[in-house]
From Swiss-Prot:
This is Serine/threonine-protein phosphatase 4 catalytic subunit A. The active site is at H119 (proton donor). The keyword Manganese applies. It is found in: Cytoplasm; Cytoplasm, Cytoskeleton, Microtubule organizing center, Centrosome. Disulfide bonds: none annotated. The modification Leucine methyl ester is found at L311. It comes from Danio rerio. The gene is ppp4ca. Keywords: Cytoplasm, Cytoskeleton, Hydrolase, Manganese, Metal-binding, Methylation, Protein phosphatase.
Length: 311
């Protein structure tokens, strides 16, 4: 099956199917990923995004909460979206979640930007659920392989109107400028260390300088590091995801770093609310807070114990 640009009949049908949380066929996944690859390969490591845009944090396979996000924030293409990674793992519907976002990307490439999170990785998804889910729903690892190949093509960061730097995790001691990010060869599995790893794994910390991350990857970075980076790159703030915040969003370092978290009642048990950030054409900020959607419980697997390790 081949989706030809200009004829979106099949793709529109697949989007409708995925919106109902119904799987598409394996050969359709293959074709969708091939098309997505053509689009993503053209994007920069620091993808330029124009305002107005709505910025979203981690989703983690919580499909019905993604639908709630679209309900409160507007559907694609009416609303322009930027998702900061971690589409998969932990939730029950990583397959449907990622494929819906990918199908929307192929259908409306200029209205949705997807950047890579630390869970968009072969190694991590084999531990935290996506691999097992693909196997359970498709009977083999083939769909997982198609999707993880696409992970390698996802952009590492984005910049809104040249002013707001968006990245999944945070900063790296190896990176002082956006141009240094632009030179990274991103088309690979997330390395265990180095600048690409740091962008996806690091966290802000109320300290100065750099610290050892308890996650075992990336770094903790302090307010002075942020001040230096923002000044050197003439940006007003860093927007990132990666950390659960109970209120859905959290400011750090005098409003120079913002954490946005978009998975309500994370892991179906944390009791947190979620947030998305609306930026208007003047980069004025408005937060939309939302709660978990009523869950569709049919067909849920019995919860497999996974390591309690919060990413």
């Amino acid at each position: 099956m081949c989706v030809i640009m200009g004829d979106f009949t099949d793709l529109d049908r697949q989007i409708e199917q995925l919106r109902r949380c119904e799987l598409i066929k394996e050969n359709e996944v293959k074709a969708l990923c091939a098309k997505a690859r053509e689009i993503l390969v053209e994007e920069s490591n620091v993808q330029s995004v124009d305002s107005p845009v709505t910025v979203c944090g981690d989703i983690h396979g919580q499909f019905y909460d993604l639908k709630e996000l679209f309900r409160v924030g507007g559907e694609v293409p009416e609303t322009n979206y930027l998702f900061m990674g971690d589409f998969v793992d932990r939730g029950f519907y990583s397959v449907e979640t990622f494929l819906l976002l990918l199908a929307l990307k192929v259908r409306y490439p200029d209205r949705i930007t997807l950047i890579r999170g630390n869970h968009e990785s072969r190694q991590i998804t084999q531990v935290y659920g996506f691999f097992d889910e693909c196997h359970r729903k498709y009977g083999s690892a083939t769909v997982w392989r198609y999707c993880t190949e696409i992970f390698d093509y996802l952009s590492l960061s984005a910049i809104v109107d040249g002013k707001i730097f968006c990245v999944h995790g945070g900063l790296s001691p190896s990176i002082q400028t956006l141009d240094q990010i632009r030179t990274i060869d991103r088309k690979q599995e997330v390395p265990h260390d180095g600048p690409m790893c740091d962008l996806l794994w690091s966290d802000p910390e109320d300290t100065t300088g750099w610290g050892v991350s308890p996650r075992g990857a990336g770094y903790l970075f302090g307010s002075d590091v942020v001040a230096q980076f923002n000044a050197a790159n003439d940006i007003s703030m860093i927007c990132r995801a990666h950390q659960l915040v109970m209120e859905g969003y959290k400011w750090h370092f005098n409003d120079t770093v913002l954490t946005v978290w978009s998975a309500p009642n994370y892991c179906y048990r944390c009791g947190n609310v979620a947030a998305i950030l609306e930026l208007d054409e003047h980069l004025q900020k408005e937060f939309i807070i939302f709660e978990a959607a009523p869950q569709e419980t049919r067909g849920l697997p019995s919860k497999k114990p996974v390591a309690d390790y919060f990413l």
